[in-house]
C-alpha cells in the first residue's frame, strides 16, 4: 500500500481578507479529518494549511493510495428466526442477506457461509445463551481518487462561509450550456497531487491537474507547474512569486515592518496590531513594505483619530516616536515590488490625505461647541425603545454615580462624579464619534480638556467605558471608577430588567463584558461596596420602566466571577467553596481563596471538610422537623466529648473571629483547624439524636455554632472529597 504526501489546492478569485486565515485552517483540518474517516490518512498524518488571497490549499502527510480492507461482522437475527426446523433459510433471513448484498441464489450455500455464535457474553451463572446468526464480510477500502472526491466535497461544505456567491460556469459535456456554481468566490483551478501523481477529482466544475497560477502581476511563469506535493510552497515562491503559507507571509511582513522602522532611525516604533497584521497578510501574496508620510499639520488632531483612520480605512501601520507619540510617517504593505516605488508611495500618500483632512475638519468643528451645550441633545437620541433616550440614560447614570460616590468619598466625590456622568455621553453627538464610534469616551476626554475641565474630570469621561476588553486598564482616578461602575450597572440593571439577557454566544449589549468590568473594579480596586446593595441602589433610577431582576443579575455576576477565577488558575472546588457563601465584598474574594488554598494544604483539612459536610447534612435534616438555634446550654452537656468540643469552641472561636475581623482569613482557618481532634471525638462518642428533646436540641445547637464558625471564609463542606 503506497503512502505519499498529498497536496490539494483550490485556485480562486480574491477571498474575503478577514475570513482567509480561518478558511485555510478549516479547509486543511476538515480535509485531513475526512480522509482519516475513510482510512486514507492515519492518526500520524499532519495537515498544513496554505492560504493566500487567491488560493486555499492543504498539504497532508502519509496518505495511502488505497485504504485497507475492513472485516465487518454483523449480527443478523436469532437462529430460531433465521432457520427453520430443517436448518434451511427462512424468508426473513434471505431478505436480510439480500439487503446486505449477499448472493442468495443458492440458499444452502448462503446459510453455510454464516456463522453461529452465542448472542451476548456468557456469565458464570448463565452460560446457555441463545445462538444468533452472524454475517462476516470484507469491505474493500476506498481508493484515493474516490475517497479524495468525497473528502473534498465534505471539506468544502464545512467551510465557515458567511455568504455564498453564485456564478455561472460553462459545462464540459457534449451539449453546450451553463451551470450555476455556489462558493465563497469563483474558483478557476484545482490542483491535486499524491506525491508526483495527479489524483483525478472534480469539484466546483473543475478537474484536477498539476498546474496553478502565481502572483497576479509578478509571476515568473504562467501557469506554474507543481511536480510534487512536497514542492508546492517552494515552486510557488520560485516560479509564481507567491508566499503560500499564511504564517510565513505574516512573519515576512513583521520582519519588513521592523526593518523599515529601523532604517528610519532608533526613535521609531511600529504600532503593531494583531488583527490588522492578519488582514494585511490576507491581502498580499508577496509583501513589500514601503515608507510614506503625510503633512505635519495633521498631527494637531488627536493621534487616536489619525491612527484609527489609517488602520481601519487604509490598512496602514502608523509609526510612533520614543514617547509613544504619532509621527507623520507610516508604513504600507504593498502587493507589488516595482523597481521604482515612488508611484506606489505617492498614490498611498495621496489617498490618505483626504481621510486625515476629514478627521481634522471633524475635530475643528466639534470644538466649536462645548460638551455642556450638547447635553440637551441627548434627549433626541434613542438609547432603547423600552429604556428611553440617551438623556434619560444619562440621568440614571448620574443618580447611580451619586449614590456610589457618597459611599466611597462623600459629597465632594459625589458632585464631581455627577458632573462627569452628565457629560460622559455627550461626545456621541460629535462629528468625530459619528464617523468613528470606536472613539467614544476618548474624544469626550479631549473635548473636556478643551472646555477647561480639570484632568480628573477629563480622564473620568475618557475612562468611563473601561475596561473595554479583557486585560484593558481600569479607570485612572476615583471619579472615573465611580462613573464607569455607574455606567455598567445602568446597562446591566436596565437590560436584565426588560429581559434582554445573553443567550448562548449571543450578547448584543455586551452584558458579559460589563459584568466582568464591574467585577474587576470591585476586586482590583478593593472597593467597600456590597454587590447586592450596589445592584439594589441602581434599580430605583429606572422608575417603572423595568421589573426588578436584582437576584438574577447578582447570580449572573457571580457566574462570571467564577469563570474568571477559574481562568486565573483557581480550582473549581476552591471557587465553589468561596462563592457558595455569596460574599458581598468582591474585593475580599482573592484573600478568601488564598486562605482556602492554605487550609487545604493542612493535614487536618480533609477530616474537617468531611465533618463539616456531615454537620451540614445533620442540620439540614433537623431543620425539617424543628428550627435549630445556634445556642448551647452548658448545663445540658453530659458527655465528655461534647464538653471538650464546647470548651475548645470557647477557646478557639473568639481567636478565629478576631482574625476574621482583621481580614486575616488564612490565619482564621488555621486557628479553626485545631478543632479537628475534638470534632472527631464528638462524633465518635456522642449520640446527636438523643431521645431527650432538650439534649438533642442542645447538641444540634452546638453543631450549628460550630458550623457557623467554620464557614465564615468559605463553605468548607464543598472541599470534601
Identify the residue ranges that each predicted region occupies.
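Amphipathic alpha-helical "coupling" segments that flank catalytic cores
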Residues: 1-721
Amino acid at each position: 500500500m503506497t503512502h505519499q504526501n498529498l497536496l490539494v489546492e483550490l485556485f480562486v478569485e480574491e477571498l474575503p481578507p478577514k475570513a482567509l486565515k480561518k478558511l485555510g485552517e478549516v479547509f486543511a483540518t476538515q480535509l485531513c479529518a475526512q480522509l482519516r474517516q475513510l482510512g486514507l490518512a492515519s492518526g500520524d498524518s499532519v495537515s498544513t494549511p496554505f492560504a493566500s488571497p487567491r488560493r486555499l490549499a492543504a498539504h497532508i502527510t502519509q496518505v495511502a493510495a488505497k485504504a485497507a480492507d475492513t472485516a465487518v461482522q454483523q449480527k443478523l437475527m436469532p437462529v430460531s428466526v433465521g432457520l427453520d426446523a430443517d436448518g434451511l433459510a427462512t424468508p426473513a433471513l434471505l431478505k436480510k442477506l439480500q439487503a446486505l448484498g449477499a448472493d442468495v441464489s443458492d440458499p444452502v450455500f448462503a446459510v453455510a457461509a454464516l456463522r453461529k455464535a452465542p448472542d451476548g457474553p456468557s456469565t458464570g451463572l448463565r452460560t446457555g445463551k441463545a445462538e444468533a446468526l452472524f454475517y462476516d464480510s470484507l469491505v474493500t477500502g476506498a481508493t484515493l481518487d474516490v475517497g479524495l472526491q468525497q473528502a473534498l466535497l465534505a471539506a468544502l461544505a464545512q467551510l465557515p462561509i458567511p455568504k455564498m456567491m453564485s456564478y455561472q460556469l460553462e459545462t464540459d459535456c457534449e451539449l453546450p450550456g451553463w451551470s450555476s456554481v455556489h462558493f465563497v468566490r469563483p474558483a478557476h483551478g484545482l490542483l491535486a497531487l499524491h506525491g508526483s501523481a495527479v489524483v483525478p477529482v472534480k469539484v466546483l466544475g473543475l478537474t484536477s491537474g498539476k498546474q496553478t497560477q502565481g502572483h497576479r502581476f509578478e509571476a515568473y511563469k504562467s501557469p506554474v507547474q507543481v511536480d510534487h506535493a512536497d514542492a508546492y510552497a517552494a515552486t510557488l515562491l520560485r516560479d509564481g512569486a507567491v508566499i503560500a503559507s499564511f504564517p510565513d507571509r505574516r512573519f515576512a511582513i513583521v520582519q519588513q515592518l521592523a526593518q523599515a522602522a529601523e532604517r528610519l532611525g532608533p526613535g521609531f516604533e511600529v504600532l503593531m496590531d494583531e488583527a490588522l497584521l492578519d488582514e494585511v497578510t490576507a491581502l498580499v501574496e508577496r509583501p513589500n513594505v514601503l515608507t510614506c508620510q503625510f503633512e505635519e499639520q495633521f498631527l494637531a488632531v488627536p493621534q487616536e483619530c489619525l491612527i484609527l483612520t489609517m488602520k481601519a480605512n487604509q490598512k496602514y501601520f502608523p509609526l510612533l516616536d520614543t514617547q509613544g507619540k504619532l509621527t507623520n510617517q507610516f508604513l504600507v504593505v504593498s502587493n507589488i515590488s516595482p523597481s521604482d516605488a515612488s508611484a506606489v508611495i505617492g498614490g498611498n500618500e495621496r489617498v490618505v490625505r483626504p481621510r486625515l483632512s476629514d478627521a481634522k475638519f471633524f475635530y475643528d468643528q466639534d470644538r466649536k461647541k462645548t460638551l455642556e451645550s450638547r447635553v440637551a441633545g441627548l434627549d433626541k437620541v434613542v438609547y432603547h425603545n423600552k429604556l428611553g433616550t440617551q438623556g434619560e440614560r444619562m440621568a440614571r447614570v448620574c443618580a447611580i454615580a451619586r449614590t456610589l460616590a457618597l459611599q466611597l468619598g462623600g459629597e465632594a466625590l459625589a458632585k464631581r462624579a455627577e458632573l462627569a456622568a452628565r457629560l460622559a455621553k455627550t461626545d456621541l453627538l460629535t462629528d468625530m464619534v459619528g464617523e468613528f464610534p470606536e472613539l467614544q469616551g476618548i474624544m469626550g476626554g479631549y473635548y473636556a480638556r478643551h472646555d477647561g475641565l480639570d484632568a480628573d474630570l477629563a480622564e473620568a469621561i475618557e475612562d468611563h467605558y473601561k475596561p473595554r476588553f479583557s486585560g484593558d486598564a481600569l479607570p485612572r482616578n476615583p471619579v472615573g471608577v465611580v462613573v464607569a461602575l455607574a455606567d455598567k450597572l445602568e446597562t446591566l440593571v436596565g437590560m436584565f430588567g426588560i429581559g434582554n439577557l445573553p443567550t448562548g454566544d449571543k450578547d448584543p449589549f455586551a452584558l458579559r463584558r460589563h459584568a466582568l468590568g464591574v467585577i474587576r473594579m470591585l476586586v482590583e480596586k478593593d472597593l467597600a461596596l456590597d454587590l447586592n446593595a450596589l445592584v439594589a441602589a441602581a434599580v430605583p433610577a429606572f422608575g417603572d420602566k423595568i421589573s426588578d431582576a436584582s437576584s438574577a443579575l447578582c447570580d449572573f455576576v457571580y457566574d462570571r466571577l467564577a469563570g474568571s477565577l477559574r481562568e486565573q488558575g483557581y480550582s473549581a472546588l476552591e471557587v465553589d467553596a468561596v462563592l457558595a457563601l455569596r460574599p458581598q465584598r468582591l474585593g475580599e474574594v482573592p484573600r478568601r481563596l488564598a486562605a482556602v488554598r492554605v487550609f487545604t494544604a493542612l493535614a487536618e483539612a480533609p477530616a474537617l471538610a468531611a465533618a463539616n459536610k456531615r454537620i451540614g447534612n445533620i442540620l439540614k435534616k433537623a431543620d425539617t422537623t424543628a428550627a435549630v438555634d445556634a445556642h448551647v446550654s452548658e448545663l445540658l452537656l453530659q458527655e465528655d466529648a461534647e464538653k471538650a468540643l464546647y470548651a475548645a469552641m470557647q477557646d478557639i472561636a473568639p481567636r478565629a473571629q478576631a482574625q476574621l475581623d482583621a481580614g486575616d482569613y488564612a490565619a482564621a482557618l488555621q486557628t479553626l483547624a485545631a478543632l479537628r481532634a475534638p470534632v472527631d471525638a464528638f462524633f465518635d462518642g456522642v449520640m446527636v439524636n438523643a431521645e431527650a428533646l432538650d439534649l438533642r436540641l442542645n447538641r444540634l445547637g452546638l453543631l450549628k455554632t460550630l458550623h457557623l464558625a467554620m464557614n465564615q471564609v468559605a463553605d468548607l463542606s464543598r472541599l470534601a472529597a
